[in-house]
Amino acid sequence: MTAILGPKPNQIPLGAMLPQQTAAGPIKTTTITSGSGTFTPVVTGGLCVVKLIGGGGGGGRGTTGIQAAGGGAAGVAVEFTARPTAALSYAIGAAGVGSTTNNTAGTAGGLTRLGNWVAPGGTGGTATGAAAAAITVGAGWVTGGAGGTGGTGATGQTGSAPGGLPAATGTAAGGSASTGGGGGGGGDSTDGSGGAGGNGDATTGTAGSNATGYGGGGGGGGAGGTTTGNGGNGSAGYILILEYGNV
């Protein structure tokens, strides 16, 4: 197997790794976005280019006061080639759920699996406002962006982009502050955007937004003196399989 990297499923650099005969494109494209089951290749032993993304973590919800919750981290992406000679079982990583209880972290996203290959889900956003750390991965994998930190009477931090560095360069902004701090933005995956952090308020914080696409992290809830905002939900993972047959 050969590990490759690519930012989007329709931008995999096939010319750099596949024979010239594949220039006409795949003979079949399979996209799986939910559930579990079995994948059977069109051609036994045929070349498959595969991308897996784990589910994104849900955003946290803080305790009453000025400290907002952190955003959820995004799911990991892994790309590889394989020549399966039999059917492979698969399961899509579920979206992490944003917290709806005071002083509680969001849940982690589920791992996505195809055969023996797995893409881990992102960690849930914290109730304390600390960043939901990105998962450390090896070569051929792309780390999902970390969740942004919740603000302590201040604006929440933007979530991180896939790959993780530099921090706070993702698309999901932290929430604004008004006495209570803003929630941290969710991390971005290669194929999903994190949810924005909820806004803080002197009395009632707002909820973090849900992630979009595949594998994004949910936004952290905003802080409030009497009521804190819920965390936003992450988004589920997915599987992309491009089949090229006997090449």
Show the residue positions of the predicted features.
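Enriched but not universal
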Residues: 1-49, 81, 238-247
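Bulky hydrophobic/aromatic "packing anchor" residues in well-ordered structure
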Residues: 119, 214-215
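Intrinsic-disorder/low-complexity loop/linker signature
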Residues: 9, 24, 64, 116, ...
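Acidic, low-complexity glycine/serine/threonine-rich segments
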Residues: 93-158
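Collagen triple-helix signature
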Residues: 71, 106-109, 124, 144-162, ...
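Short loop/turn segments at secondary-structure transitions that flank enzyme active sites
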Residues: 56, 120-125, 220, 245-247
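Ser/Thr- (and often Asn-) enriched beta-sheet segments in non-cytosolic proteins
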Residues: 13, 29-40, 87-91, 116-118, ...
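Glycine-rich strand-loop-strand elements at beta-sheet edges
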Residues: 31-38, 52-116, 195-201, 206, ...
